[in-house]
């Protein structure tokens, strides 16, 4: 089924089986860790400040497959200096066969990022620890609420995640 979905053709048996949502591939698209002020930052007694940015992009690969990229940038500063910047883009290819556009939109905006998020959490934590800093655990994110907010914003535009190349922010 994987080759058929990635090549844009659903097998006749799949169509007869009804709607399908499949995980075709999960992979790291991009990863970066910088600690520009190490090792001096390890002795900084200032309270660290964290800034988290989250972004989701969706790209239609063909009629039955979509790439979803969940991007997280975590910036830690202490005493006005950057302690570290961790950037992760975790991606997945998802097969969506026999579903109406609204169901596809909901799955792309909620289920797919929920599937990718544990991978992002682990990678961010591992990067930060490998950089010599205490572990940081991303807290759960309510992608359903983010999707509902995004949906309200898009209703006036008449767009959907499935129709767009990159879908923008989540």
Curated annotation (Swiss-Prot):
- Which Pfam families does the UniProt entry name for this protein? SecB
The upper taxonomy is: Bacteria, Pseudomonadati, Pseudomonadota, Gammaproteobacteria, Lysobacterales
Which Gene Ontology cellular-component terms appear in the entry?
cytoplasm
Under PANTHER family, the record lists: PROTEIN-EXPORT PROTEIN SECB, PTHR36918
Q: Report the function annotation for this chain.
A: One of the proteins required for the normal export of preproteins out of the cell cytoplasm. It is a molecular chaperone that binds to a subset of precursor proteins, maintaining them in a translocation-competent state. It also specifically binds to its receptor SecA.
Asked if the keyword Protein transport belongs to this entry, the reply reads: yes
Keyword entries, A-Z: Chaperone, Cytoplasm, Protein transport, Translocation, Transport
Q: Where in the cell is it found?
A: Cytoplasm
User: In the UniProt record, does the keyword GTP-binding occur?
Assistant: no
What protein name applies here? Protein-export protein SecB
Q: What is its main location?
A: cytoplasm
Q: How does it assemble?
A: Homotetramer, a dimer of dimers. One homotetramer interacts with 1 SecA dimer.
> Which domain of life does the UniProt lineage start with?
Bacteria
What would be an example GO MF term here?
A: unfolded protein binding
Q: Give the matching InterPro entries.
A: SecB (IPR003708), SecB-like_sf (IPR035958)
Origin species, per record, is Xanthomonas euvesicatoria pv. vesicatoria (strain 85-10) (Xanthomonas campestris pv. vesicatoria)
Q: Which family does it belong to?
A: Belongs to the SecB family.
Which gene name belongs to this protein?
Answer: secB
**Gene Ontology BP annotations:** protein folding; protein tetramerization; protein transport
């Amino acid at each position: 089924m994987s080759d058929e979905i990635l090549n844009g053709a659903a097998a006749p048996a799949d169509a007869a089986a009804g709607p399908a949502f499949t995980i075709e591939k999960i992979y790291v698209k991009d990863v970066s860790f910088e600690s520009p002020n190490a090792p001096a930052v390890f002795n900084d007694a200032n309270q660290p400040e964290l800034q988290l940015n989250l972004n989701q992009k969706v790209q239609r690969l063909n009629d039955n497959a979509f790439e979803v990229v969940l991007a997280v940038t975590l910036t830690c500063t202490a005493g006005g200096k950057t302690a570290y910047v961790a950037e992760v883009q975790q991606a997945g290819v998802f097969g969506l066969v026999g579903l109406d556009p609204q169901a596809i939109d909901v799955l792309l905006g909620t289920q797919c990022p929920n599937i990718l998020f544990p991978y992002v959490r682990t990678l961010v934590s591992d990067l930060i620890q490998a950089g010599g800093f205490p572990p940081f655990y991303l807290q759960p994110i309510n992608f359903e609420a983010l999707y509902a907010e995004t949906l309200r914003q898009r209703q006036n535009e008449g767009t959907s995640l499935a129709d767009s190349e990159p879908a923008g922010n989540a």
